[in-house]
Amino acid sequence: MEQNNCKIRTWFAKLALAQKVFLGVIPLFFICFVFVIADIVISLQNKGHIIEEIDKFTNQSNVMLLIYACWYVSKPKSHYLKNQQFFLSAFAYIIFTFLGYNVILAASQQAYSDKDAYSLASSVFLHVLAPIAFLVAGIVKMKTDKDVTFNHFWKSLGYFMIYPLVYGLYLATIPYVRGHYVSDDGKSTTYVVYGEITNTKDNPIVAWPVVICFLFIYFPLSFLAVYALQCKLLNRPLKAQFKCATNKCPK
């Protein structure tokens, strides 16, 4: 037992500061993962399907946080973490989760409308605690992990946009594809992911501009902000990252 404890202490001592911070927030990310799985099970039991849980950007982005944190702590030099692509993308995605729920959905009175304690706790963990924890840990990583390389901006943006574009396509077409379904209150309605602002079928004048603006304005600009923050904290000129055409831009 003492020998095992010694190995753990030695392993912990070798971790970089950012790895230690991410290690500290893994339990929080795991709790959020449990909430996601629990909601999937509850949906399957009560409704016979899980689509309303697995198609939420919130749930997907929170699972992404746990995967990244565990991977970075255990294998920071992994091929899949090279060029900061996973990290920078997850950082920008979780900002959208935080702002999308606490600003946009809150303004339309769709946020924190849960009446039971469990649902409210789930919302707080997934939309507030986990995003803030990842952003704090991420900034520590940006500031202290100097030995990193990342793709030039346009290539990095291209990889980053794959997920939003696929998700946006789903978001815009699911009202047509799934059609009408019976909601929790027993009414037959068009299936949408995030209320009327994403109802491209019945509310196209509002929904289509919202979807298009987020895909082609918000997401590129938000990633630019995250990318610029990384460059600033590493004291690297942002302008050079636009011109560099190699996989690894100069430090």
From Swiss-Prot:
Residues of the signal peptide: none
Highest taxon in the source lineage: Bacteria
Membrane-related topology note: Multi-pass membrane protein
Primary localization: membrane
Subcellular location field: Cell membrane
Keyword Zinc-finger: no
Transmembrane intervals: 22-42, 86-106, 120-140, 157-177, 205-225
GO cellular component: plasma membrane
Pfam families, per database record: DUF1600
Keywords: Cell membrane, Membrane, Transmembrane, Transmembrane helix
Protein name per Swiss-Prot or TrEMBL: Uncharacterized protein MG452 homolog
Record organism: Mycoplasma pneumoniae (strain ATCC 29342 / M129 / Subtype 1)
Lineage: Bacteria, Bacillati, Mycoplasmatota, Mycoplasmoidales, Mycoplasmoidaceae
